A protein has these predicted regions:
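Short Lys/Arg-enriched alpha/beta "domain-start" segment
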Residues: 1-269
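Generic structural hydrophobic/aromatic packing signal, biased to beta-strands
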Residues: 12-14, 132, 271, 278-281, ...
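Generic "edge-of-domain/loop-turn" microfeature
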Residues: 18, 139-141, 278, 286-287, ...
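N-proximal short alpha-helices
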Residues: 87, 287-291, 346
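A broadly conserved detector of short glycine/acidic/proline-rich loop/turn motifs that flank catalytic sites
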Residues: 136, 284-286, 342
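Extended, charged amphipathic alpha-helical segments
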Residues: 233-316
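Membrane-associated alpha-helical segments
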Residues: 297-416
Length: 419
């Protein structure tokens, strides 16, 4: 029996890096873009997010919660330049992109999969690590197989190798986007990263493919107290690993499961986390799963996921900085600040939220990466101190030699005078 969906959405997340020396100019660029709007979080409107994150993380991650009353009025009246100065000093800045109308697209040919782009958000950290996020919803289809194919195809549309492929798989039919290239051009325009820049980018830090963050709720007749989840396992693993519907059903499950962490705290929903995706799979047998859960997953959990990705990319960027001798001294302050503010900090008292973040941290191997960087830096810093001490010793020796010469000359002069 073909699986049917009750509700679904997918966020595609593209990380990119802005030179930290140009970060304030990039913020100014977004502020001047008429379609970009600086996002101000408000306690009344975003109460779930406000209550979910602990104060220290909330103050770091969502500084605009403090924008209220006269502070908010003053900010709104400020010039673009002044807003840029305020925003660029904050740890995190969020922008929404005005689509004017929902953008409808199509994957495939005449009988392809219609979808709409519902939301675009830009999340920037002061370190220069940013995220372009795009929310999509499939329309005119409740086939689970269509969701599998859509997620699989769409995650690669920003690939630098896309021009080597046929465009048969993805076609955009809308007055806003005439072709899939329009989406990639929008990404390039917002991020400021051209194809030429992509070639220069360090691929060990970021890639051109999207991270996939997806939610799907199946119709209750597919998964309930009378059904066996074993019949859903193959589809669940394909969904979890962003694989197409026609992927060989005899694939090596043990290998895929080795790279997959599944959270199963509740009976009728599972959250599957890999290094490049976080996908929630649930049943409509429980009304919570299609009422409150999708909202929570695309708000509290979504920002938790972004924070986990940020930590991973920040550490990988620090690791890459070891290649540049001049960066080693500068990275010390960044590493200390990161450790002080974000490392080994609880982000929430919500049990499920903590479980999700801890699982994500384990999948992204954050502890291993942190320890590796800490050990590398300790070794290199000791070497730098040894070099520094050697220089000091050399200077002392030179000064002693000059002192000896000076004293010798003085003695000779005195001897000459008395003689």
């Amino acid at each position: 029996m073909e699986l049917k969906t009750k509700y679904q959405y997918t966020y595609f997340i593209y990380p990119y890096i802005v030179d930290d020396k140009k970060y304030d100019k990039y913020i100014l660029k977004l502020l001047k873009d008429k379609k970009c709007k600086f996002k101000i979080f408000q306690k009344e409107k975003d109460l779930d997010i406000y209550n979910f994150f602990l104060p220290n993380i909330r103050n770091y991650y969502f500084p605009t919660f403090e924008f209220r009353g006269e502070v908010l009025k003053e900010f709104n009246k400020s010039s673009v330049e002044k807003k840029k100065s305020i925003i660029s000093k904050q740890n995190v800045a969020c922008f929404t992109y005005d689509l004017a109308e929902d953008i409808q697209g199509k994957v495939g040919d005449e009988d392809g999969i219609f979808f709409k782009v519902e939301d675009i958000e830009i999340i920037c950290f002061r370190s220069g690590i940013c995220f372009f996020t795009l929310k999509t919803i499939i329309e005119n289809s409740n086939e689970f197989a269509d969701l599998l194919d859509f997620n699989y195809r769409f995650k690669d549309i920003n690939s630098e190798f896309l021009n080597l492929k046929s465009f048969e798989n993805i076609k955009i039919q809308t007055s806003t986007f005439s072709d899939v290239k329009d989406i990639t051009e929008l990404i390039a325009d917002i991020t400021g990263i051209s194809k030429k820049d992509k070639e220069k980018r360090v691929e060990s830090i970021v890639s051109s493919n999207f991270y996939t963050y997806s939610y799907v709720c199946l119709e209750s007749n597919h998964w309930n107290e009378k059904t066996n989840f074993d019949y859903l396992e193959s589809d669940f693993l394909k969904y979890s690993n962003v694989l197409p519907k026609d992927f060989n059903s005899d694939f090596d499950k043990s290998n895929i499961e080795h790279r997959l962490h599944v959270i199963e705290k509740m009976k009728y929903y599972k959250t599957a986390v890999t290094r490049t995706s976080s996908n929630l799979f649930c049943s409509g047998i429980d009304t919570y799963n299609y009422t409150l859960l999708p909202h929570k997953y695309e708000n509290e959990y979504f920002y938790t996921y972004i924070l986990g990705l940020y930590k991973s990319l920040f550490l990988r960027k620090l690791d890459d900085d070891f290649k540049d001798y001049d960066q080693i001294i500068k990275m010390r302050a960044r590493f200390i600040e990161f450790s002080r503010v974000l490392w080994n900090k609880e982000i929430t008292v919500d049990d499920e939220g903590s479980l999700y973040f801890n699982t994500l941290s384990r999948v992204l191997e954050l502890d291993e990466c942190y320890k590796d960087i800490s050990n590398k830096y300790e070794v290199i810093y000791k070497e730098l101190n040894i070099e520094k001490n050697n220089i000091y010793y050399q200077i002392i020796v030179i000064l002693l030699i000059f002192s000896l010469m000076f004293n010798t000359i003085n003695i000779l002069v005195l001897m000459y005078v008395f003689l």
